[in-house]
Amino acid sequence: MWQIYSDDNGATWSDPIPTPMLGFPPHLLTLSDGRLLCSYGRRAAPFGQRVMISEDGITWNHASEITLRDDAPNHDLGYPVSIETQPGEILTFYYQKPAWNPDNKHDHTTAIYQTRWQLSDFE
């Protein structure tokens, strides 16, 4: 995942900067304490849902990656949305598909999941 930023309300933009986040698509949430949370689907093994938190929205530390789930059977997952239901309590919604079934190529079963978690569990 790459990021760009603007210091002038979008009139100009920085060059793209790589982040340590290996996934997409991202969803950004400003937490009640001012930090920025990015939730995303990891579409490479181990497949699942991840989160990173940044103090400033510019620097991201891979060591701070939080694994919400790593049990997805394939890369068809993601589109997370996170909300802070109260300070420090996060609810993240996303979709995952079941494992590919070669006997039923038209099986498009999809499930919407949620993970309720506490920031304090990872700090």
Where are these regions (language model features)?
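Asp-box/BNR beta-propeller blade signature and adjacent active/binding-site loops
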Residues: M1-E123
